[in-house]
């Protein structure tokens, strides 16, 4: 079934900034997709086209991207009469029309909006759930329910506190299924709220962009202590492990790192990559930290390689790899990390996201599907993580509706799968796919 009509508009993301939404019509009905947006972005990401008109939305409008869909992409796809199940063919058409390496002509936000809507329409055309259609596109016979990585303490560019490291996450790997993982996550979250309130006062329980708490603490170790205390109070010490997203590129200064980067600049407090690595190893030794994302700057290849070789945990590339096959290939060759963070808007199409995932998995890496800090109510990544069988997803705390929208969709998928549903659990890094 081909596309009858395609229409894009400006809507608002969870930070109140404009983003692109696309409506796609076939004989099966209307299929809608919205595009997310990040705060700490890797410099190698595909280009998110903003208007840069300072008189409108402080330059963050997306009317140009919307216009590219409505004036150029829509007529071309409608005229071509391509069947919506042909995801790769449609994505390739858009990439050829754009003609740039980083999608700077149309904007990755324009191309992705259409690509996501096409994928949803393709599932309906085949009469299967979206996760099943994605599994088919990826060549997976099985589907797997992921372990959620709840970002319950926010720092870095996601919060107005002094904390340098961006995310402190809990992963309920000991849960029996996704539903229980949600319960464990929610109970620890409520316990954490009480722990923070008792220690720092009620206003310390305000939440950051992703629904996690953002108490005004400076020491990263203090965040881990808060987690340890909340996990213990909830009674889940044996069922939860900890993950971190350091987003170290945000505080990289002249070959060193500034763990107090939100204060006035003072080079005397900068630490070396080796000192930072030792700090992480202390965390791994003293807390159940099993996953660290972006421990070093996106250009600090030597530090990544050294740490991954010696840390013995999951080391996740985000700013380093930006869901880009060329960057992933380099990271594989350099042995820089062992897990890919998969963000559809970093690369800008469903087909390329699937290729990035396959490339990582083929090389023995884990893959973690991820939201962005500026999100919408769109739930595409919930189906994506199940269909790609990656076994792990991070889409915020169990708080804020744009985060829960994804988790709730996975709950529905688990219910629908019934006895066929397999939960990744402790095998989240490398779930067995039949």
UniProtKB/Swiss-Prot annotation:
InterPro entries: Enolase, Enolase-like_C_sf, Enolase-like_N, Enolase_C, Enolase_CS, Enolase_N. Binds two Mg(2+) per subunit. Required for catalysis and for stabilizing the dimer. It is an enzyme of class 4 (lyase). Its cofactor is Mg(2+). PROSITE patterns: ENOLASE. Pathway: Carbohydrate degradation; glycolysis; pyruvate from D-glyceraldehyde 3-phosphate: step 4/5. Transmembrane segments: none annotated. GO terms for biological process: glycolytic process. GO terms for cellular component: phosphopyruvate hydratase complex. Keywords: Cytoplasm, Glycolysis, Lyase, Magnesium, Metal-binding. Its EC number is 4.2.1.11. One of its GO terms (molecular function) is phosphopyruvate hydratase activity. Homodimer. This is Alpha-enolase. It comes from Sceloporus undulatus.
